[in-house]
Amino acid sequence: MRHYEITLIVHPDQSAQVGTMMEKYKEIITTGGGKIHRKEDWGRKHLAYPIKKIYKAHYLMMNIECDQEVLDKLNYNFRFNDAILRNLIISEDGVITTPSIMMANKDKEKGRS
């Protein structure tokens, strides 16, 4: 099985459904024999440029290990989910479990408050 990093940009009006959306994708991955090594919710962030006249969006990121069939099923679900504005799937060399830079920055900001 290969390792992938998936980043999702979700419509801000659908932020309340992010939890159920992630559970659905987790179920697809685990029933296909895959594993989720890291799952992060970056929250609402400003977009670098507007997408469909939207200036903020909810960001999600996960590192998974799965085969091509599961990845195709996930990609199909991402494509036909209107709540997902953009998705990015990157192939990784190995397992990544350390917090991302975004989460490290978020933790630093919480520490200052």
From Swiss-Prot:
GO-annotated molecular function: small ribosomal subunit rRNA binding; structural constituent of ribosome
Disulfide bonds: none
GO BP term, pick one: translation
Superkingdom per UniProt: Bacteria
GO annotations of cellular component type: cytosolic small ribosomal subunit
Keywords (A to Z) from UniProt: Ribonucleoprotein, Ribosomal protein, RNA-binding, rRNA-binding
One Pfam family of this chain: Ribosomal_S6
Function statement: Binds together with bS18 to 16S ribosomal RNA.
Family: Belongs to the bacterial ribosomal protein bS6 family.
Entry protein name: Small ribosomal subunit protein bS6
Protein's organism: Ruthia magnifica subsp. Calyptogena magnifica
